[in-house]
């Protein structure tokens, strides 16, 4: 699984948390898969956490948002931070900065 936003230091916009949750749920239920590796595109950052530019747009009203979609899924940041005990390993291949929620991903796997 590659976080592919190198121009934004692989920060995650709100919708991506739910997309990652869906992908990881599929991974958990796919018997042929034994391990998942998560990494960031580019060489500068693994993940800079939440997309703060998007957050500022929400606060100033320049971007509309569904408040329910803005919340993290029950499994936490990027669908990972509260996903303990699922049984299948997730490896964080950290290639650069891991800031905020990006560091949270690393701590949990």
Question: Which sequence ranges carry the predicted segments?
Answer:
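Conserved CoA-thioester-binding segment of acyl-CoA-metabolizing enzymes
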Residues: 1-44, 56-58
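An acidic, glycine-rich surface segment that forms the CoA-thioester-binding/catalytic face
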Residues: 17-21, 25, 52-95
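Acidic-histidine catalytic/liganding microenvironments
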Residues: 30, 49, 87
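Short, active-site-adjacent cap segments at secondary-structure transitions
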Residues: 43-47, 99
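Short glycine/serine-rich donor-binding loops of glycosyltransferases
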Residues: 102-103
């Amino acid at each position: 699984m590659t976080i592919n936003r190198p121009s934004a230091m692989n920060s995650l916009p709100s919708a991506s948390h739910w997309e990652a949750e869906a992908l990881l749920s599929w991974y958990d239920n796919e018997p042929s898969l034994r391990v998942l590796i998560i990494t960031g595109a580019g060489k500068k950052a693994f993940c800079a956490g939440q997309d703060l530019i998007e957050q500022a747009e929400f606060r100033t009203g320049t971007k509309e948002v569904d408040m329910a979609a803005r919340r993290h899924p029950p499994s936490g940041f990027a669908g990972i931070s509260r996903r303990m005990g699922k049984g299948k390993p997730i490896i964080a291949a950290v290639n650069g900065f891991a800031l905020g929620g990006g560091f949270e991903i690393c701590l949990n796997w």
